[in-house]
Amino acid sequence: MSGLAYLDLPAARLARGEVALPGSKSISNRVLLLAALAEGSTEITGLLDSDDTRVMLAALRQLGVSVGEVADGCVTIEGVARFPTEQAELFLGNAGTAFRPLTAALALMGGDYRLSGVPRMHERPIGDLVDALRQFGAGIEYLGQAGYPPLRIGGGSIRVDGPVRVEGSVSSQFLTALLMAAPVLARRSGQDITIEVVGELISKPYIEITLNLMARFGVSVRRDGWRAFTIARDAAYRGPGRMAIEGDASTASYFLALGAIGGGPVRVTGVGEDSIQGDVAFAATLAAMGADVRYGPGWIETRGVRVAEGGRLKAFDADFNLIPDAAMTAATLALYADGPCRLRNIGSWRVKETDRIHAMHTELEKLGAGVQSGADWLEVAPPAPGGWRDAHIGTWDDHRMAMCFSLAAFGPAAVRILDPGCVSKTFPDYFDVYAGLLAARD
C-alpha cells in the first residue's frame, strides 16, 4: 500500500468475518517507555508494528536503551534508571504518543536534547506541557514558534517546590507525559510529586490507560478525582517480566462499524468487555444507532442493517469527549443515518494529526452530505436520495481519515481514497484486512 497515490474502493454490499486486531498504539508506546524506565527486563508481546512505534523504538535505541530485535510483535527491553545517552537529536515524526512523554522524561532527567518531527508535528501544541515542566525548573527552548515543537531540552535546574499545574483542556497527553515521568524525579528528589489539573480534563479514558499501565510497572498514583495526582517519593518502576499489549480499540471501531452497516456478523478479537481502553465504548454508540452488539472475553461482535440495500442507522446527538478517535468513525456512519447527526465536545480534533473537524467537514461534503461545524462540534446530515456524489477523498496525511472513509464504499457513489499508505501510522495492512470482510455489489 505504501507509495500508492490512490485506492479505488469496490462498491460494498455485505461485511462479515473476524479480525485479529493489531496492538493498541496508545498502550504500545506507553509500555515501551515504561519498560525503558523500569528496573529489570520486560518482554513485550503483541506490540503494534507502525510508524509511531518504530519512532519510539528508534528513539529509545538512540538514547542508549537496550532494545532487542522486534519479531512477530515481540521485543525485550532492558530498563535503565536514566538514559545513558545524554546528548541526542531525536526525530519523532508525527507521533504525539512519543513526542510528549519523551519531552517530559528527558526534561526531568537532564541532558542536552533536540526534538523535532514532521511539519504537522510542529503545528501541534506542546506549550502547556512545557509550562508545567518549567515549574520543575526544566530548561526548554522553542526552536521555532513559541508553544510548538521543535524543542531544545537542557540547561535547567530540576527541583520540586510544590504542586505542578498543567492545563487539561487541550490534550490529555500532557498529563500522561507528566505522570509517566514523575516517578523518576520523585525517587531522585526524595519528595512526593503532585500534579494538579487546570481546566476541564479531556479524553479521561486515556489517563485511565496511563494509570493502569503505571500500576502494572509498580507505581500506584494517589488521586483526587480528576483534579490532582500524587506520586510517592519512593515510587519506582519495576519491569513486570512480560507484558501483553491489547488490540487497538480505536482500530476496532472501523470493523465494528462494518458489521453495523454491512449486516455482519463482524467480530474483532484482542479487545473485549475487560479492555482498559476507553474506545471500547464506541460499541455502545453503535448499539444506540441500532446495531446488535455482543461482548465476550477478548472479543466484540456486531450485526446490523444493510445500508447498501436501503437500511438506515438511527441518528444521534452525543458528547464524544471521552472517545475522540472513535468519534471519527461515528461521523462517517452519519452518512447512513435516518436524520442529521451531531458530534459534540470534539475540540481535541483540532490538534490531532490534522485539524480533523475541518478535514471531516471537507470530505463528507464531497460525498453529498450536508455538514456544519464549529470550534468543537460537527453536524452531518446524510445525503438526500439521489444526492450522493462520486468523490476523491483526501486523507490529510491522517491514518484515521483513510480508515474512516473506507466505510463510504457502502453508499451508491464511487469512492477513491487518496494516499492510502498513510494508514502505516497505525495499521499498514488495513485495506487488505478490510477487503477480506467485504462482499461486493453486483
From Swiss-Prot:
Binding-site residues for phosphoenolpyruvate, renumbered to this chain: 25, 96, 124, 173, 356, 400, 425
Family note: Belongs to the EPSP synthase family.
Alphabetical GO biological process terms: amino acid biosynthetic process; aromatic amino acid family biosynthetic process; chorismate biosynthetic process
Primary enzyme class: transferase
Catalytic residues (positions): 325 (proton acceptor)
Catalytic activity: 3-phosphoshikimate + phosphoenolpyruvate = 5-O-(1-carboxyvinyl)-3-phosphoshikimate + phosphate
Residues that hold 3-phosphoshikimate according to the record: 25-26, 30, 171-173, 203, 325, 352
Primary gene name: aroA
Superkingdom: Bacteria
EC number of the protein: 2.5.1.19
Keywords for the protein's UniProt record, in alphabetical order: Amino-acid biosynthesis, Aromatic amino acid biosynthesis, Cytoplasm, Transferase
Compartments, as annotated in UniProt: Cytoplasm
Statement: the UniProt record of this protein carries the keyword Transmembrane: no
An example Gene Ontology molecular-function term: 3-phosphoshikimate 1-carboxyvinyltransferase activity
PROSITE patterns assigned to the protein according to its UniProt record, in alphabetical order: EPSP_SYNTHASE_1, EPSP_SYNTHASE_2
Pathway: Metabolic intermediate biosynthesis; chorismate biosynthesis; chorismate from D-erythrose 4-phosphate and phosphoenolpyruvate: step 6/7
Subunit structure: Monomer.
Name the UniProt record assigns to this protein: 3-phosphoshikimate 1-carboxyvinyltransferase
GO cellular component terms, semicolon-separated: cytoplasm
Source lineage: Bacteria, Pseudomonadati, Pseudomonadota, Betaproteobacteria, Burkholderiales
Its job: Catalyzes the transfer of the enolpyruvyl moiety of phosphoenolpyruvate (PEP) to the 5-hydroxyl of shikimate-3-phosphate (S3P) to produce enolpyruvyl shikimate-3-phosphate and inorganic phosphate.
